[in-house]
Amino acid sequence: MSKRVKLHVGTREDMGKRFVSAWHRLERGERVRERHVTFPDLASMLNALTPKRLELLRDVHREPAPSVKALAERLGRDYKRVHEDVETLAASGLLQREDGRVSAPYDAITAEMRL
């Protein structure tokens, strides 16, 4: 089964409603598998998902990196910039870091924005 994450542009209230909905489903014994990341505005989402960061995500999804240094070398990019990108993506929940390793836990990312 593929792991997916859904990106949203929304308010804390929107995020809270999704949380409460998931909580109630868990209370009823339902399994809750969806993952969500909410950004306060479109600019924040686009800042987190620059073309270079998307390239990094795709690369790490294909092959997890043993370290940020190894990832920077593999991508042919400056270590400092790759480190910044990894930190931003990890803070957004789109990358995982464990014991120095960098991995992308999701197979698909979808985005939703209300007008």
Label each region the model flagged.
Residues 28-55:
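Short alpha-helical segments that sit at the start of domains
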